[in-house]
């Protein structure tokens, strides 16, 4: 069964300042929790466009949100195609965009999807089941240097070199087929004292491979870039991240958008007349409270950042 606990639901949707009659985008439909809250705030007016790559998520959400069917359009696509998908539907501008970058709980928990290091399953990790690249291909065919690079960069794993070497040595004997095999290889590569410290020893490597399989950071950067352009003046973007790589990218891109525009030297401009194209609504990220973390431990690492497109004076 598809079930998913929505993280920072009230904070993120309230942060969008949804107005009845507006046009909004939920880039990560998942279980439909955020979409349901946005549609409720729209009060039967306006429209929501909801993206997801996962057919199971779309089917579940379509049934869950059936009472809002006149006000929602479901789009099966990676959110990196937000601009093209909306333009195909005659939409050039929107009033708010939401990203929840957590992998949805059903994907993590369903063994057959190959995301979980707690359950043995074929190596897959594709968000979009129609995509060609799988975790099996990454683990068995990517050269040592590339494996080392992604495990280090995307997993921020201290033992990335040792893990990549161990994978390389193992696959010379036979292909690595399952998540269980990969977990055992990772455990062998990490020194015993380090294995006993912190979380699961395979967590960072699995994260790295998942990000690589789905090009998550590249897709996120593309979607943010197009999202800024799509927003109406006064429109807002809310982003929930779950690990430092996503949060760093979001923070950096938000910072760039809130800088004053570059002006030619010597131009007689009064500083007060200069205006950045965007303004930060959250000076520091909003995090889950103790009550939410107690109910859903995955909320512990969630960070919410919100930005607004400024109204430009002529």
Curated annotation (Swiss-Prot):
Belongs to the methyltransferase superfamily. RsmH family. GO terms for molecular function: rRNA (cytosine-N4-)-methyltransferase activity. It comes from the Bacteria. S-adenosyl-L-methionine binds at residues 32-34, 52, 79, 100, 107. Coiled coil: none annotated. Specifically methylates the N4 position of cytidine in position 1402 (C1402) of 16S rRNA. Pfam families: Methyltransf_5. It is an enzyme of class 2 (transferase). Its main location: cytoplasm. Gene3D superfamilies: Putative methyltransferase TM0872, insert domain, Vaccinia Virus protein VP39. It catalyses: cytidine(1402) in 16S rRNA + S-adenosyl-L-methionine = N(4)-methylcytidine(1402) in 16S rRNA + S-adenosyl-L-homocysteine + H(+). The gene is rsmH. GO terms for biological process: rRNA base methylation. Keywords: Cytoplasm, Methyltransferase, rRNA processing, S-adenosyl-L-methionine, Transferase. GO terms for cellular component: cytoplasm. This is Ribosomal RNA small subunit methyltransferase H.
